[in-house]
């Protein structure tokens, strides 16, 4: 959420910045709300002065033994007016807040303008894209030959865009997540968290998923008890970022406790209505997928550098797996609702002959902290200040699995296991096709 003073006092500047995200700031609606709020606030102030003066008059009348009936009636009417106007201003403030919650974060000046993938800037490439002298198979074909990917059973059990992994493919998938977590804990200094997969509405507002992305989420509803008509509503997490960020809700830390670095491996659930064609093929875009998520909570002066660091941490996973990738600086129209600057890491998929996003690394600045009231004190000033938050996929486990299957396939009918994963798979070096 944007700072209220910034929004109202520098409206044109904010509107110009948000236009880069293709967001139109409705000045008339916002100004109307604000003008009405000021009018009501002045009425409250006048009524409070009138009530104070009336109280003095009543005290004086009591001392002079004057009949208080008329004065007490005036006092009751004043209180009723105050209650009514305060109720109106609460409703108005709620409307203003709801509008504020629909406004995205301001993009950094340094990121490029644009709304298409072609407007993103390639920062660098890492690794060698191999040339194969045999016919390449995609990850679904490879998975079926190995007997490790079962789409039909998943469709029968649940529906489309779900998967079942089994055998050595499931083993490889598990090894990947364990490897990633270990690297981030042991080498990068993160603390591991085990998190709820169901979250409440406050958490979704706090992280910025609501109100915009309601229709992209899986919502549940359960009866509190057999004898009760009350229902409890929760939502399945779209990313571990949501519960990780909300750990800091209504928390104030000392600056010496910063940075706070958190990591979690969770399934993620996204409805994401719409069609993606071949881009949704297989494990590329499913309703349920696993991801290792990184979140950093830092001093405002450190978030620019922290974005480079958290991105490097995600890159390190791809480098250790020896998977070719490229690093993209996203244009203003492509960054997320909450982000002010984002790097995407795109891994090379040889069967598709293209790069595919495997990690998104973003600086959120104080956008989430203002929603969740996450603050710090420096020990000098009594007043606390808002923290900055950052997040990154470290990385998407399913897409890493896809990249390994396709990049490590061999002509003799095997999948070579990356060297760093072999210790996580009891020393295995290859996965063989079922018919071998």
Swiss-Prot record:
One of its GO terms (biological process) is seryl-tRNA aminoacylation. Keywords: Aminoacyl-tRNA synthetase, ATP-binding, Cytoplasm, Ligase, Nucleotide-binding, Protein biosynthesis. InterPro entries: aa-tRNA-synt_IIb, aa-tRNA-synth_II, aa-tRNA-synth_II/BPL/LPL, Ser-tRNA-ligase_type_1, Ser-tRNA-synth_1_N, SerRS_1_N_sf, SerRS_core, tRNA-bd_arm. It catalyses: tRNA(Ser) + L-serine + ATP = L-seryl-tRNA(Ser) + AMP + diphosphate + H(+); tRNA(Sec) + L-serine + ATP = L-seryl-tRNA(Sec) + AMP + diphosphate + H(+). Pfam families: Seryl_tRNA_N, tRNA-synt_2b. It is an enzyme of class 6 (ligase). ATP binds at residues 270-272, 357-360. GO terms for molecular function: ATP binding; serine-tRNA ligase activity. Gene3D superfamilies: Bira Bifunctional Protein, Domain 2, Serine-tRNA synthetase, tRNA binding domain. Its main location: cytoplasm. It is found in: Cytoplasm. Consists of two distinct domains, a catalytic core and a N-terminal extension that is involved in tRNA binding. Catalyzes the attachment of serine to tRNA(Ser). Is also able to aminoacylate tRNA(Sec) with serine, to form the misacylated tRNA L-seryl-tRNA(Sec), which will be further converted into selenocysteinyl-tRNA(Sec). This is Serine--tRNA ligase.
